[in-house]
């Protein structure tokens, strides 16, 4: 005899709250979810998350510092940093022969540190 399991991931009947649905649909209008999705895609790369975390720990780091931290070449570090800069996760400033990177703003730091705290809760139970 085969055991039947209920699907707990979906409603058993289709019924929705029209007022709630219309309110939320209205709130979705005009939002730039494509840019938000792009930001999360860039952060889906483990190396870039490490770089972003490093930038949370220090006010700024030069490309050489980042390369040393992640154990790669300056060119590779610069490539990853460019992705972070293009989506306003990080910003850069050239000083003489060095380029320094920092987080674009406090929102990014909050986002990253909140995600890290959430992940740590999962691991620690």
Feature names for model-found ranges:
Residues 1-43:
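N-terminal leader segment of winged-helix/HTH proteins
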Residues 12-13, 85-88, 118-119:
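A general structural signal for short secondary-structure boundary/capping elements
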Residues 26-73, 99-106:
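N-terminal helix-turn-helix DNA-binding core of bacterial DNA-binding proteins
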Residues 53, 79-82:
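Base-recognition residues in the alpha-helical recognition helix of bacterial helix-turn-helix
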Residues 57, 100-125:
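Conserved segment of winged-helix/HTH DNA-binding domains
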Residues 75-77:
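DNA-recognition element of transcription regulators
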Residues 85-95, 102:
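Beta-hairpin "wing" of winged helix-turn-helix
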């Amino acid at each position: 005899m085969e055991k039947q399991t209920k699907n707990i991931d979906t409603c058993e009947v289709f019924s929705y709250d029209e007022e709630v649905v219309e309110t939320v649909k209205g709130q979705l209008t005009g939002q730039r979810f494509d840019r938000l999705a792009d930001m999360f895609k860039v952060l889906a790369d483990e190396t870039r998350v490490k770089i972003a975390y490093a930038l949370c720990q220090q006010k700024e780091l030069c490309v050489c510092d980042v390369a040393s931290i992640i154990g790669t070449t300056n060119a590779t570090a610069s490539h990853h940093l460019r992705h972070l800069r293009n989506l306003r996760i990080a910003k850069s400033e050239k000083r003489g022969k060095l380029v320094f990177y920092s987080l674009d703003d406090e929102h990014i730091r909050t986002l990253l540190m909140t995600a890290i705290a959430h992940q740590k809760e999962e691991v620690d139970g």
